């Protein structure tokens, strides 16, 4: 008996709104069923890693905001840790608490967008509108500390650029008090919703072995039941002083990945609360004059301070020769920075490890045997942003 079935090839994207950026997906389909999914990337490639080689360590920081532009401060965090590792500089405790506080606010910023847009892709409009209201408040906190809502450029090797404005901690405290009820409202809309579960349960299943073999991290790995979190396994800054749980899934399907992200927001609220309670007084950046510019007051009094400031911002500071790899638990997974220095004021090589790159590679095996509508659901739970994938 001959098999006369003819497969069709379908181009999805790069303009399609459900591809979350500039993904071109070539689907080989047997009717409505997907046989293969071939992602074509590179449409947002800007040569970030090469550009960083021509910038001082200070000038390189804004490039990290533009990688995963949904969670900018976590990207800056990884670069700051890498430079600090080469410099062997001590970061003041207050600066460490501020960095952890804003990393967790960034996690909420990321997950609210992901869950809202995931619901919208599947056909639920309400969660996106409710969650964007909450994201707006976090973006205002960003604006208070850095002057910018998105590309914050706030973290620095050796600390943060400026102290928290007066009253900001109280505002953040009010936010985390009123935020959990809003999350409960979203959960009541989605968790047991029959249509939501039909679209997510048993779709895009990833076993523990597959998650490990493909190099998944973050909610993609924890959704498959592996409790791996760099904040616990390899803590940085003051995460070792924080009390929180690592939520995991059971089945590794789209529903588990959605639910892990939902639970992670509750854990982030706990960490933020602890940061506010334990926040010490003191300096917000290292006192090493090679890294920290003089204050405005000093520059008005001393010509040497003015020259020091000028040289620091034009030539930058020299970093000893060496290499290091530092990774943070970004909202999407393990975001790592490998820095290689030959001495001098510019990195010789800066390699960026983006979690979304590995996750997108798994789209092919996750989509096989599913309908085309399910591919949209799977892309949404991958939580991909092409700023970091294409770099």
From Swiss-Prot:
Its main location: membrane. It comes from Rickettsia rickettsii (strain Iowa). The lineage of its organism: Bacteria, Pseudomonadati, Pseudomonadota, Alphaproteobacteria, Rickettsiales. The keyword Transcription regulation does not apply. It is a peripheral membrane protein. Signal peptide: none annotated. GO terms for molecular function: NAD binding; NADH:ubiquinone reductase (non-electrogenic) activity; quinone binding. Pfam families: Complex1_49kDa (PF00346). Disulfide bonds: none annotated. The keyword Transcription does not apply. Keywords: Cell inner membrane, Cell membrane, Membrane, NAD, Quinone, Translocase, Transport, Ubiquinone. It catalyses: a quinone + NADH + 5 H(+)(in) = a quinol + NAD(+) + 4 H(+)(out). Its EC number is 7.1.1.-. GO terms for cellular component: plasma membrane. It is an enzyme of class 7 (translocase). NDH-1 shuttles electrons from NADH, via FMN and iron-sulfur (Fe-S) centers, to quinones in the respiratory chain. The immediate electron acceptor for the enzyme in this species is believed to be ubiquinone. Couples the redox reaction to proton translocation (for every two electrons transferred, four hydrogen ions are translocated across the cytoplasmic membrane), and thus conserves the redox energy in a proton gradient. This is NADH-quinone oxidoreductase subunit D. InterPro entries: NADH_Q_OxRdtase_suD (IPR001135), NADH_UbQ_OxRdtase_49kDa_CS (IPR014029), NDH1_su_D/H (IPR022885), NiFe-Hase_large (IPR029014). It is found in: Cell inner membrane.
């Amino acid at each position: 008996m001959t098999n006369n079935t003819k497969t069709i090839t379908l181009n999805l994207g790069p303009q399609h709104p459900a591809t979350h950026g500039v993904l071109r997906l070539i689907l080989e389909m047997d009717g409505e069923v997907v046989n293969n999914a071939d992602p074509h990337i590179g449409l947002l490639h800007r040569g970030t890693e090469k550009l960083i080689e021509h910038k001082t360590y200070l000038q390189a920081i804004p490039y990290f905001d533009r990688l995963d532009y949904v969670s900018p401060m976590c990207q800056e965090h990884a670069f700051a840790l890498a430079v600090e590792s080469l410099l062997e500089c001590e970061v003041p405790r207050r600066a460490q608490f501020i960095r952890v506080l804003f990393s967790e606010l960034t996690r909420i910023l990321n997950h609210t967008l992901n869950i809202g847009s995931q619901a919208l892709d599947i056909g639920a409009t309400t969660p996106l509108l409710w969650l964007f209201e909450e994201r707006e408040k976090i973006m205002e906190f960003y604006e208070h500390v850095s002057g910018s809502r998105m590309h914050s450029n706030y973290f620095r090797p050796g600390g943060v650029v400026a102290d928290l404005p007066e009253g900001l901690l109280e505002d953040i405290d009010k936010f985390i008090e009123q935020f959990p009820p809003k999350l409960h409202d979203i959960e009541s809309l989605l968790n047991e919703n029959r249509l939501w579960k039909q679209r997510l349960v048993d779709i895009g299943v990833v076993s523990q072995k597959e998650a490990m073999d493909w190099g998944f991290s973050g909610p993609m790995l924890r959704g498959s039941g592996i409790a791996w979190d760099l904040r616990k396994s390899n803590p940085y800054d003051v995460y070792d002083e924080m009390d929180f749980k690592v939520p995991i899934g059971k089945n590794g399907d789209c529903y588990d990945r959605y639910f892990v992200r939902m639970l992670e927001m509750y854990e982030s609220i706990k960490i933020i609360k602890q940061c506010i309670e334990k926040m010490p007084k003191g300096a917000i950046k290292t006192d090493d004059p090679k890294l920290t510019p003089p204050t405005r007051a000093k520059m008005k009094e001393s010509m040497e301070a003015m020259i020091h400031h000028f040289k620091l911002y034009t030539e930058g500071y020299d970093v000893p020769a060496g290499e290091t790899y530092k990774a943070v638990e970004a909202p999407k997974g393990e975001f790592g920075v490998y820095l290689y220095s030959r001495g001098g004021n510019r990195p010789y090589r800066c390699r960026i490890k983006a979690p979304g790159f590995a996750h997108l590679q798994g789209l092919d095996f996750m989509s096989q045997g599913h309908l085309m509508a399910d591919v949209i659901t799977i892309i949404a739970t991958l939580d991909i942003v092409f700023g970091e994938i294409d770099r």
